[in-house]
Amino acid sequence: QAYQHLADSLDTIQATQSETMGVSHYEGGKDYYADIVQNQLGVKATPDEIAKEISQAQDDAFQNLLQIALSYQDLIMTEDYTNIEYQEAPTPEAGLDYLKTKITGVFPSIDNLNYQVYTVPEGNRDGFAPAAYLTGKIDMGENESESIMINPDSQGNLMSTLVHEGYPGHMYQNSYLRSLDYPAIMYLTDCIGYSEGWAIYTESYTAEFLEDETEKALTMIAQAETDYTNLLLAYTDVQINQNGWIYDQFYDYLCE
């Protein structure tokens, strides 16, 4: 009943802005956006300073993407690198077990984890992420299980997803931090630049963890494209919400 009331209430909300614009077009919007960026990323740099760094990183990422694409152009023409079938991961559980063995010696060791993989209910799959790690409780007992949700309707590369959500991504990250016995205040802070940044960073190890050369090459192609796309989205986010780009400017930038 509560969820139905929420759904009904959301349906009554009417947009007051007919233009597609960022928060910079609202009073105090630029300051608000700058505060959000610094708070969520955990940095002191201004949005424009961040955009400058992103732009430089974009150039490097594009050159890397171009080099990899040229190196594996035959694979790009014949294989679907956006939906790779990994022999090491016939199931999500098998993939996690495999990754657990591959991070040894690369990342600090942690205790053996209990974890359960759940399927996202059919009614929630539309719009749900490819997967989600459900953050464990602060006082989680040794015999309690970590939980990862998998969306079977999502098209994507399972191994990269398992790296991001499991080993050595979110599940590993949270378990490792709990093992350090940090003050409880650490668990109350909210800095997505730290938590999500770590998981995205670990995706760069996916190809390194693989044995099959074709899977490795396809993963490198997919990762290079993802890296460039992430930087593109981050750069345009700043331009739209800090510098007032409208739709036409965004479109022109993408067409360059």
PLM regions and their residue ranges:
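N-terminal maturation segment of proteins
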Residues: 1-256
